[in-house]
Swiss-Prot record:
Function of the molecule: Nucleotidase that shows phosphatase activity on nucleoside 5'-monophosphates.
Assigned protein family: Belongs to the SurE nucleotidase family.
Species of origin: Pseudomonas fluorescens (strain ATCC BAA-477 / NRRL B-23932 / Pf-5)
UniProt protein name: 5'-nucleotidase SurE
Gene: surE
Any one GO CC term of the record: cytoplasm
Gene Ontology molecular function terms on file: 3'-nucleotidase activity; 5'-nucleotidase activity; exopolyphosphatase activity; metal ion binding; nucleotide binding
Gene3D superfamilies, per the entry: Survival protein SurE-like phosphatase/nucleotidase
Lineage per the UniProt record: Bacteria, Pseudomonadati, Pseudomonadota, Gammaproteobacteria, Pseudomonadales
EC number: 3.1.3.5
Length: 249
């Protein structure tokens, strides 16, 4: 078993080191990750300049690009042997609900699945490393589960681990994505020369976070496992849209 590990926090982030350590004695692991923090990169590819791999002293490979770039290169000839699976994380910070639209952590897994490998993304619901060992434990547990290799086509798993010690975790729940309220307005800043700039503000709170959602699971102390699909077609809208378009044809 060969596993390609990536993330969006960057190749030197503590989460990817913890993930590699958790899986290194289970499989042959190769780390390919961005050379800097690329949180929020989503599934973007770098098309305006060449990408340069650089092998660090610990054997990890850094790329001057996005998480999707890293997985794309890793599964398209950069490595001598093709990986069998893609594992992304461990992200420091939640990827719940609508976060998946922006997450580079989730995007790395999606790229792996697009390139026909089983893929899973892990996030610790905290910006701190205190309970990173809890996330690493569940990452190993879920990666080793045989069912990951039998996922439906074009499906990945998005896993969020509560910020709790291992013995406080209540179990694992299969969940759907919740939804966040609208984010706060961007924060305006003015530099010493009077030029305005803007910081993207924090994500909104959970608006749809009731039982069955990923938000609810982690709030109750459960690891949340949410299946995501590459196909974003909203099939239930076909009937109403067909009637609307009929008058335009």
């Amino acid at each position: 078993m060969r596993i390609l590990i990536s993330n969006d926090d960057g190749v030197t982030a503590p989460g990817i080191a913890a993930l590699h350590a958790a899986l290194a004695d289970y499989a042959e692991c190769v780390v390919i990750a961005p050379d800097q923090d690329k949180s929020g990169a989503s599934s973007s590819l770098t098309l305006d300049r060449p990408l340069h791999p650089h092998t660090l002293g610990n054997g990890f490979i850094s790329i001057n690009g996005t998480p999707t770039d890293c997985v794309h290169l890793g599964l398209n000839g950069l490595l001598e042997h093709d990986p069998d699976m893609v594992v992304s994380g461990i992200n420091l910070g939640a990827n719940l609900g609508d976060d998946v639209l922006y997450s580079g952590t989730v995007a790395a897994a999606l790229e792996g699945r697009f390139l026909q490998r089983p893929a899973i993304a892990f996030s610790l619901v905290s910006r701190q490393v205190e309970n990173l060992a809890t996330a690493a434990y569940f990452a190993r547990k879920l990666v080793q589960a045989q069912g990951l290799l039998d996922l439906p086509p074009r499906t990945v798993l998005n896993v969020n681990i509560p910020n709790l010690p291992l013995d406080h975790i209540r179990g694992i729940q299969l969940t759907r994505l919740g939804h966040r309220a609208r984010a706060a307005a961007p924060m305006k800043v003015v530099d010493p020369r009077g030029k305005a700039g803007y910081w993207i503000a924090a994500a909104g709170d959970a608006e749809d976070g009731g039982p069955g959602t990923d938000f609810h699971a982690v709030m109750q102390g459960y690891v949340s496992v949410t299946p995501l699909q590459l196909d974003r077609t909203f099939n239930d809208a076909f009937r109403s849209l067909d009637g609307w378009l009929e008058g335009l044809r």
